[in-house]
Amino acid sequence: MRRAVCPGSFDPITNGHLDIIVRASKLFDEVVVAVLINKSKAHLFTIEERIDLIRDAVRSHPDAPTNVVVDSSHGLLVDFCRVRGIQSIVKGLRAVSDFDYELQMAQMNHSLAGVETLFMSTNPQYAFLSSSLVKEVARYGGDVSGLVPDVVLKGLRDRSAP
């Protein structure tokens, strides 16, 4: 079975993330979305909320894949891959600046565990998009409806409600 992981903090998941996950699901038998736990980072959504948001977003996508599972991970991503028998990491690249960092990570992951990294170019309509940008725009009452799945939009609105 060809298995891949799409890692990230997904705080929150964006339409750009979702696009990469759905596209990866067409290339692999199973795609595991690994929600990375970083306790030193302040998150808007809890790990459980992020997992639920991702599951709901994938399920409600027009091309809803049935081969996507969501899990959480702390520690080294290659250890997560090794324990679960995952051979590939899928990463979306928005710009050349992403490539510099991601290439170093890919080389390290390969040297540590022989895990391959597949880079997918982001759909141009999402090239500027990041979770941080979504949170910033939403924090000031901006419209993020075209940037995140509906379930995330509801979650963001619930967070900003008085």
Swiss-Prot record:
Q: In this UniProt entry, which cysteines form S-S bonds?
A: none
Swiss-Prot/TrEMBL GO biological process terms: coenzyme A biosynthetic process
**Entry-linked CDD domains:** PPAT (cd02163)
Q: Where does ATP bind?
A: S9, F10, H17, G92, L93, R94, E102, Y126, A127, F128, L129, S130, S131, S132
Report the catalytic activity.
(R)-4'-phosphopantetheine + ATP + H(+) = 3'-dephospho-CoA + diphosphate
Q: Where is this site: Transition state stabilizer?
A: H17
Q: What keywords are assigned to this protein?
A: ATP-binding, Coenzyme A biosynthesis, Cytoplasm, Magnesium, Nucleotide-binding, Nucleotidyltransferase, Transferase
Q: What is its EC number?
A: 2.7.7.3
Q: Which residues bind substrate?
A: S9, K41, L77, K91
Cofactor dependence: Mg(2+)
The pathway where this protein functions is: Cofactor biosynthesis; coenzyme A biosynthesis; CoA from (R)-pantothenate: step 4/5
Q: Which family does it belong to?
A: Belongs to the bacterial CoaD family.
The annotated subunit structure for this chain is: Homohexamer.
Q: What does this protein do?
A: Reversibly transfers an adenylyl group from ATP to 4'-phosphopantetheine, yielding dephospho-CoA (dPCoA) and pyrophosphate.
What is the designated name of this protein? Phosphopantetheine adenylyltransferase
Q: Which species does this protein come from?
A: Parafrankia sp. (strain EAN1pec)
Gene that encodes the chain: coaD
